[in-house]
Curated annotation (Swiss-Prot):
Gene of this entry: proS
Keywords tagged on the record: Aminoacyl-tRNA synthetase, ATP-binding, Cytoplasm, Ligase, Nucleotide-binding, Protein biosynthesis
Origin organism lineage: Bacteria, Bacillati, Cyanobacteriota, Cyanophyceae, Synechococcales
NCBIfam families in the cross-refs: PRK09194.1, proS_fam_II
Domain notes: Consists of three domains: the N-terminal catalytic domain, the editing domain and the C-terminal anticodon-binding domain.
GO process annotations (BP): prolyl-tRNA aminoacylation
Role noted for this protein: Catalyzes the attachment of proline to tRNA(Pro) in a two-step reaction: proline is first activated by ATP to form Pro-AMP and then transferred to the acceptor end of tRNA(Pro). As ProRS can inadvertently accommodate and process non-cognate amino acids such as alanine and cysteine, to avoid such errors it has two additional distinct editing activities against alanine. One activity is designated as 'pretransfer' editing and involves the tRNA(Pro)-independent hydrolysis of activated Ala-AMP.
Protein name as annotated: Proline--tRNA ligase
Substrates-to-products reaction catalysed: tRNA(Pro) + L-proline + ATP = L-prolyl-tRNA(Pro) + AMP + diphosphate
Length: 609
């Protein structure tokens, strides 16, 4: 990597105002600092400064992958549809999540631009791995991925193309898979520590990659503007993405009702209004929420979920449960789960639904007779609702509720499920003495124990020691390289600009010449740049014909860790050394600049195991 660069010769144009397209501070700063430029929504050019950052991140990732036995390769970006159909994920990625770019070539064959490479790598393993003697194997690549995001936003956080490292491991048994999974866990932790980031590892939902039963963990870079909510215990014994988190809900209040009764409750279509009208706690109310599940055989299923009034539905957990019920409806997988809004309810063509006053026994007659609509409502009850006695719920008539209701008396108890959303303030399920706290995070890495999810449908097998054919055990491990770069900015910036961690900064030091017309300032700067480069210190030389104030503002904006200024102190044989992170400025002798910076940079790059 080039050790020094004159800023006057670089393609470098900064912006003084925040671009209107940007929402996050990190997105604004990357645009203003000439790190990226948008070509179209979700598609960005990586300019020279950011490209250096991405190269450094990639090299750290590469070193840590190689250290645990990973072998680098490069897989095709263009993938035939048939291998996705073989794994059973074509419909999920083109219809349900709809994030895959699908196209037809001139022969009419369906292709896709790879959002991920499980199918490609499994096909490769099926072709090349024959015997247990070849196992385990870990392959990885660093390349551009494509996802057709519905709403690309936040710069590199949610783009339509992005740089990612994805690794895949193959094993003879589950024990070997778990060992590599732990190796990856440690490698990912080292990557983020080496990149200078504060992070937390959390239990996570495996999504369409792993499926509802796969073990997985996410690596979250902590940032107040993070898209994901994390729940964790203060002692560090538990942390999970809110999509996966479990907890003990607060206890319900004691019911004042001892007998079943129908009450007129006009204008109480929300839990808040009903609780205020009856002067009761929302913990005594069973709310009933309608959803529609769409399976891959085209069947739509109305789902009525009963849950305690003070709780929210975790739709990821609900979708996972409905995925496990696919066989019940002669389907392979769930394509989509949606709240049954007015449009969906009208599409059912049944009796009117008393929205806001629905009871657990809402009649099936709200569903019309249709070919692709299940004739009966699937009824589920969250544990929080199932435990209530003498509760309040809808009366199946607009303006009416019932009080003093009980399961097994007025209403049959539906199938009981755990689909509530854990929240801050709940007690930890694993240690009830710990109260869950919340933080925001940016998902940077995700590791999965896939098990046999891909090897079974794609017939990827090996011959074991007894000569029997066995399916390969598999893991996959992703880390967003371009996403990590922006996450670092989101975590570390101030009002003046970016504060890059030393390990991934585009340059270690920027040498600023306040007045290029001063021969002494220029000659000292030139000598310093040469000496720093010789010492292996990456140096940006701001030799532009600009005012000193502009140069200082730009230096702060682009976030180079150290700034050397050849200014007034030259008369005393000194230059000014400013640390970007702290803003601390000191004057040091010119002859001590190289050794001082070398010591500081080496200290910053030293990461304990």
């Amino acid at each position: 990597m080039q050790q020094s660069q004159r800023l006057s010769q670089m393609l470098f144009v900064t912006l003084r105002e925040d671009p209107v397209e940007a929402e996050l501070p990190s997105h604004k700063l990357l645009l203003r600092g000439c790190f990226i430029r948008r070509l179209s929504p979700g598609i960005y050019t990586y300019l020279p400064l950011l490209w250096r950052v991405l190269q450094k991140i990639s090299e750290i990732v590469r070193q840590e992958m190689n250290a645990i036995g990973g072998q680098e390769c490069l897989l095709p970006q263009l993938q035939p549809a048939e291998i996705w159909r073989e794994s059973g994920r074509w419909d999920v990625y083109t219809q349900a999540e709809g994030i895959m770019f699908a196209l037809k070539d001139r022969q009419g064959r369906e292709q896709s631009l790879g959002p991920t490479h499980e199918e490609v790598i499994t096909l490769l393993a099926r072709d090349l791995i024959r015997s247990y003697r070849q196992l385990p194997q870990t392959l990885y690549q660093i390349q551009t991925k494509f996802r057709d995001e519905i709403r690309p936003r936040f710069g590199l956080m949610r783009g339509r193309e992005f740089i990612m490292k994805d690794a895949y491991s193959f094993h003879a048994n589950e024990e070997s898979l778990r060992q590599t999974y732990q190796d990856m866990y440690r490698a990912y932790s080292r990557i983020l520590r080496r990149c200078g980031l504060e992070f937390r590892v959390v239990d996570a939902d495996a999504g369409a990659i792993g499926g509802p039963s796969a073990a997985s963990q996410e690596f979250m870079v902590l940032a107040s503007a993070g898209e994901d909510e994390i729940l964790y215990t203060p002692d560090g014994s538990y942390a999970a993405n809110v999509e996966k988190a479990v907890s003990i809900p607060p206890p319900a209040a004691e019911s004042p009702y001892t007998a079943f009764q129908v009450l007129d409750t006009p204008g109480t279509e929300t839990i808040e209004k009903l609780a205020a009208f009856l002067k009761i706690s929302s913990t005594l109310i069973v709310k009933n929420v309608l959803y529609q599940a769409l399976y891959d055989n085209g069947l739509r299923v109305a789902v009525l979920l009963s849950i305690r009034g003070d709780q929210e539905v975790n739709e990821v957990k609900l979708a996972n449960h409905l995925s496990r019920l696919a066989e019940r409806y002669q389907a392979s997988k769930l394509l989509k789960l949606a709240l049954a809004d007015a449009e969906i309810q009208n599409s059912w063509q049944g009796d009117p639904i008393p929205v806001g006053y629905i009871a657990p026994d809402l009649p099936d007659s709200c569903l019309g007779r249709q070919k692709n609509l299940a004739p009966q409502i699937l009824r589920l009850a969250d544990q929080t609702a199932a435990l209530l006695q003498n509760f309040v719920t809808g009366g199946n008539q607009v303006g009416q509720h019932v009080v003093g209701a009980n399961w097994g008396e007025q209403y049959p108890l539906p199938e009981v499920v755990d689909v509530r959303k854990a929240q801050a303030g709940d007690r930890c399920l694993l240690n009830p003495d710990q109260i869950l706290e919340t933080a925001r995070g940016i998902e940077i890495g995700h590791i999965f124990q896939l098990g046999l999810k891909f090897s079974l449908p794609m017939r990827a097998t090996f011959t074991d020691e007894q000569g029997s054919e066995q399916p390969l055990w598999m893991g996959c491990y992703g880390i967003g390289v371009s996403r990590l770069a922006q996450a670092a900015v989101e975590q570390s910036h101030d009002a003046n600009g970016i504060i890059w961690p030393v390990a991934i900064a585009p340059y270690h030091v920027v040498v600023v010449v306040p007045n290029i017309s001063d021969p002494e300032q220029m000659s000292v700067a030139e000598k310093l740049v040469q000496d720093l480069a010789t010492a292996g210190i990456e140096t940006l030389w701001d030799d532009r014909d600009e005012r000193a104030g502009v140069k200082f503002k730009d230096a702060d904006l682009i976030g180079i860790p150290y700034r050397i200024t050849t200014g007034r102190s030259l008369k005393q044989g000194k230059v000014e050394l400013t640390e970007r992170a702290s803003g601390q400025a000191t004057e040091i002798p010119i002859e001590e600049v190289v050794t001082t910076l070398k010591e500081r940079i080496e200290a910053a790059l030293a990461v304990p195991d």
